[in-house]
Structure formats: C-alpha cells, structure tokens
Regions:
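Intrinsically disordered, polar/acidic, low-complexity terminal segments
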Residues: 1-7, 104-113, 226, 333-334, ...
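Transmembrane alpha-helical segments
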Residues: 1, 40-54, 87-95, 177-185, ...
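Membrane-interface micro-motifs in multi-pass membrane enzymes
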Residues: 7-51, 79, 248-266, 291-321
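Signature aromatic-anchored transmembrane alpha helix within multi-pass, membrane-resident enzymes
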Residues: 200-210, 255-267, 272-286, 290, ...
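Transmembrane catalytic cores of multi-pass membrane glycosyltransferases
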Residues: 1, 63, 80-88, 95-270, ...
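Aromatic-anchored segments of alpha-helical transmembrane domains
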Residues: 13-20, 72-76, 116-124, 208-221, ...
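Short hydrophobic alpha-helices at membrane interfaces in multi-pass membrane enzymes
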Residues: 52-73, 110-111, 329-337
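Membrane-interface alpha helices of multi-pass inner-membrane proteins
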Residues: 63-91, 162, 335-343
Length: 459
C-alpha cells in the first residue's frame, strides 16, 4: 500500500509538470484559469470528503451533519461542469456502497447529495446565465438541444483524440495512455479470472484496444494510402455545419462511432479493474473524466479551457494504474513509448532510447522508475520551451506597451503599429485583429476610437 501511494504521488506530480504544455492554452485567461483551478479543487475536496466517510469508513462526526451538506451545496454551485460531476460522483459512490459492498448508508450522505443537486440548480437556473448566453453567444442561444450538440461535439471528441493539434501533455496524450494502461492491466488481471467467458471477452477487447492504439501510432508514420484512410477516421467534422451545407452524411459520423466504441470499451476495463481490485475510485474517476468532457457538448464556448478537470482526473487514473502495474509486475512501458510516438515520432524514438538504456541497467521490476524518468525528461523539456516562448512574448508585450504610451504622449496620428507575438498560445494574445481587445486597449490607454491599430510582424 505504501509503494502504491508513493508511485501515485510521484507520477501525479510529474504529469502536473508535463501539463504546462496544455496549461499554456489558459494562462493568459487568468480569471478563467483561476476559476477552473479552484472549482476543480473544490470538486476533488468534496469527492474526498464523501469517499472518506463512505468507503474509507471514517466515523461521521457531529460537525459533518453541517459541513457535508454545505460543502456539497457550494460544490454544486461552482459551475455547470463541476456541478454535474458533484452529483454524478456522489451517485456512483452510493451505488458502490449500497449495491456492491451492500453496506448501510448514513442519511447525511443522501442529504449531502440533495444539497449538491440544489446547488447545481441554483447555478444552472440563475438568471445571469441566460443573460450571458443571450449577450455573449446569441447565435448559440437560438439552437435547440440537438443543434447545440451537433455544433460542439467535434470539439469535445477532438480534444480527446486529436493528438496532432494538442501535443505532448495535452488531453489526447493522457487519454491514449489511459486506453493503453487499462487494456494491458485488464488483460493481465483477467488471467486469474474464474469465469472463462468473461476472461475471453476481456482479453479480446484488450487486444482490440492495443491494435487500435498501434494503428494510430502507425498512421503517424504516413506509410501508404490505407494508413492515411485510417488516420482520417479520427478527423471530427462539425456535424451541424456539415448538415446545414450538405444534408445528412453518414460518413462524417464514422469517427464519432469509432471514438465512442473506444471510450465505452475503456470504461468496461476501468469498471472491471475496480471490481477485481475492490477499489471503486479508479472506475469513478475514469468515468467521471469522460463525463466531464462530455458535459461540454452543450457548452456555448470552446471546451478547450475547461479540460483541466478532465486532465486532473485522468492523472489520478494513470497514477493509480501505474501503481497497480508496479505491485503486480505488469509491464506498461511499451504503451508509454507508443503514446509518445503518437504525439511525435521524435518523442517516441527518444523515449524508446531512454527505456532501452535504463532497462539494460536496472532490474526488470524497476520499470516504474524508467517511466518516471521518461515523463520527467519531457516535463522538463516542456517547461523549458514554454519558459523560452514566454520570455520572447514578454519582451514583445512590453515593447507594445511602450509604443502605446509613446503614441498617447506624443499624439502621433491615426495609426498605431503593434508587434505580433511570436506565438499566440504562450501566455499573451495579440492586441490587433480582435475587436473587443482593440476596444479594451483603446479604452484603457485613452486612445481615440478612430485610431487604427496595425499589426507589425517581427523581422
């Protein structure tokens, strides 16, 4: 148990560092990033509170009859995504305790879930939400439920499977790691399964999942027409726009069907391992991670900036799976290498070289150390890249501020040239080209609204 905890904590920390690659997407939205971080922390605190009182059998004390409903209410009130998750995770814990462990549940647990539902309703039905929708997203507000799903579903699925766009440390990287780890561990655990039909089913599904991951990896090599066809099977098009322009086309649904099948099979693995290990936390965290992303299918804004809670839950799943593999001596390093290769072939080669080199030095039961080293190497690499890009953009930012102040002080005409950032996704947005940002800049510095802002590329 101690080994499991140590392994999980180390890997969770390394993945947190690695995640700077995707965190860059939200860093310049400081208020939003802070909100997502705090609401995620609130959700995890509430989940642990419930888990400790229900599964860990921590004695319910008098203060819990006040604190637990209050925490549940405020967790339900945090935001649409975490609000739904607070209810969903609470229900899963109740199902596990009542129907799997067949244990009595204290009434305060039901009361807490009721308060979470009330908090969720306060959040969702608040008049301000409707006003914001009408003002900020008027077109989206006019869609019915089916149209909203058709408009947003490609972003939700793309964030889980589009490894080309989001890179190392992005959500697809963690999703594919989960798919692979779940498949291998399920296969190995099923070898001791007494139910032969279940054993064969799990093994067949595990093999199919591994083949899928390997085909995705091969598609990154662009070896021939047939592989390119498979590569396009993970290309998610906007369903609503496609329907409006061309009518119903079943072919665009193929990527969604494939991706849905992959997620459902992975959920089967997560539930199976949870039952075999008699630990509900793995299944609940994994299914909740997918639900957290799925909720965004009816979101008016891009789900990119709200992936933090999904990634956070997947970190826990990966760390827990790695600790199981460590204690049961199950080899999972190969999947890690393949997943690095899926993101970038060069990453795959580097991780393979590190894996082979360390395997020749360390004993075979130390594979988990190798995995930690590989993740650590790329985590440091990501931080160095982001820090360098941030410094470059920072110098441009201060140069633009200097130009604006000089323009205001000298009243130099009706055109103001501002430098374009090196890369928009590293901490700073451009000042030119987005009307609301231009208006904010002019208003803050007292620039005449008639002044034209012109973007100047760095030579």
């Amino acid at each position: 148990k101690t080994n499991k905890n140590i392994v999980a904590i180390i890997l969770w920390g390394l993945m947190y560092i690695l995640n700077i690659w995707i965190s860059r997407e939200t860093l310049y939205w400081l208020d939003g990033h802070l909100a997502y971080t705090l609401t995620a922390a609130q959700l995890l605190f509430y989940f642990y509170y419930l888990y400790s009182r229900m599964i860990m059998n921590t004695k319910i004390r008098k203060y819990d009859y006040v604190c637990l409903p209050l925490v549940a209410f405020f967790t339900g009130w945090t935001g649409p995504q975490t609000a739904v998750l607070s209810i969903f995770m609470g229900i899963l814990l109740i199902i596990w305790k009542k129907f799997v462990r067949k244990e009595k549940i204290d009434k305060i647990i039901y009361i807490a879930n009721a308060f979470a539902i009330i908090g969720c309703l306060v959040e969702v039905l608040a008049p301000g939400n409707n006003i914001r929708m009408q003002k900020s997203f008027p077109e989206f507000a006019e869609y019915n439920l089916i149209e909203k799903i058709g408009f947003r579903v490609n972003s939700v699925y793309g964030l889980l499977f589009d490894f080309k766009s989001y890179g190392l440390g992005g959500l697809p990287f963690y999703a594919f790691l989960c798919f692979g780890f779940l498949a291998i561990i399920s296969y190995k655990i099923s070898e001791d399964e007494k139910n032969k039909v279940l054993e064969k089913t799990i093994k067949v599904l595990s093999i199919v999942m591994i083949v899928f991951i390997c085909l995705v990896f091969i598609s990154r090599l662009y070896l021939g027409k047939h592989i390119e066809i498979f590569d396009r099977l993970l290309n998610f098009e906007n369903v609503l726009e496609n329907y409006q322009n061309y009518g119903f086309n079943f072919s665009i649904l193929k990527p969604y069907i494939l991706a849905t099948a992959v997620m459902l099979v992975s959920c089967v693995f997560a539930v199976y391992i949870s039952f075999k290990e008699n630990k509900c936390i793995l299944g609940i965290m994994y299914i909740s991670a997918l639900i957290a992303q799925g909720i965004m299918v009816i979101s008016p804004y891009s789900p990119l900036r709200s992936t933090f809670i999904t990634v956070l839950l997947l970190w826990g799943v990966i760390a827990y799976l790695a600790s199981i593999a460590y204690n049961k001596n199950i080899k999972i390093g190969g999947i890690l290498v393949i997943c690095f290769g899926i993101i970038n072939i060069e990453f795959g080669i580097i991780s393979l070289a590190i894996y082979i080199a360390l395997m020749s030095i360390l004993s075979k039961d130390k594979e988990i150390i190798i995995i930690a080293v590989i993740i650590g190497v790329f985590a440091i690499n990501n931080w160095s890249i982001v820090l360098n890009k941030y410094k470059q953009n920072s110098s441009i930012y201060y140069e633009n501020i200097s130009r604006i102040e000089n323009f205001v002080n000298t009243n130099q005409g009706k055109e103001l040239k501002l430098l374009e950032p090196y890369d928009y996704i590293y901490g700073f947005n451009k000042f030119v080209g987005m009307e609301w940002i231009e208006d904010a800049v002019k208003d803050y510095f007292g620039i005449n609204p008639e002044v034209k802002l012109v973007e100047e590329k760095i030579k």
